[in-house]
């Protein structure tokens, strides 16, 4: 190793090291109709979601959101991405969802809306990612094992 006694000596040895490039600038992804498309998943449910600028109308499988998801909790889950991104009432959503139950379907649509929002407007990515909406929730039902009543529950045991 060369005798390095000062900062100038170090610079002469290292030379011009490549400087790390700035973060990737993402471009909006939209189709010919001005919509962004994304798929969302949760448990066994898979949702295909299209968003476009509009009045905030949400349609799921051809029905209004409050008709398809009757429980207020499920409707709140669908509204969360818009609330976090501060764009409530600015986008129309058209979603088709299949598989799983209502809770899983609501989670899948929420995941799809979040992904579509960040594709439509990349500046919203930071807020959605911080809230954890862009991450696929990988929790699924644990399989039943043989020799057990359920996934973990054992059959009743009688000592005598």
Swiss-Prot record:
Keywords: Ribonucleoprotein, Ribosomal protein. The keyword Zinc-finger does not apply. One of its GO terms (molecular function) is structural constituent of ribosome. GO terms for cellular component: cytosolic small ribosomal subunit. The keyword Ribosomal protein applies. InterPro entries: Ribosomal_Su5_D2-typ_SF, Ribosomal_uS9, Ribosomal_uS9_bac/plastid, Ribosomal_uS9_CS, Ribsml_uS5_D2-typ_fold_subgr. It comes from the Bacteria. GO terms for biological process: translation. SUPFAM superfamilies: Ribosomal protein S5 domain 2-like. Coiled coil: none annotated. Belongs to the universal ribosomal protein uS9 family. NCBIfam families: PRK00132.1 (NF001099). This is Small ribosomal subunit protein uS9. The lineage of its organism: Bacteria, Pseudomonadati, Pseudomonadota, Alphaproteobacteria, Rhodobacterales.
